[in-house]
Amino acid sequence: MANNPEGATKEEPRDLKVERISAGAPGQGPEKPQVIVAPSADVLSGATSTDVPDLGEGTYLAAYWGERPTGGYSLAAESARLEGNRVAVRLTLKKPPRGAILTQALTYPYAVAVVRDLDPRGKRFSFTDQNGTDLGWPVRLVS
């Protein structure tokens, strides 16, 4: 911790540990990309109407890529960094390889993860892709 000129304590930027809980591409889900952030597995379970396993303390998140035209898409929460009250989470979005034989059905890729050592209260969340491009996805904080 460092002191700024006004004497207030300021936390140094730090990388946060992200643990994967689940991921997939089911046949139903939100049509547009979005992220839900919660202070516990129980709260995220209620917000998503699913059973999110409780892996202990941390900030839980569910990221939805939205509707995709075929199978072969995947999404993962890879890393997170805390700078002041801003949390930047990097997602990896993978498209199917060109020429791949794909399921011809609408799919809805998602990823559920827990960010360790982070209390979501008072934080602003942003999400980027693997190239660092801001996704601009809406983020819903639930408590």
Predicted regions and their residues:
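Exposed, flexible binding/inhibitory loops of compact, secreted disulfide-stabilized domains
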Residues: 1-143
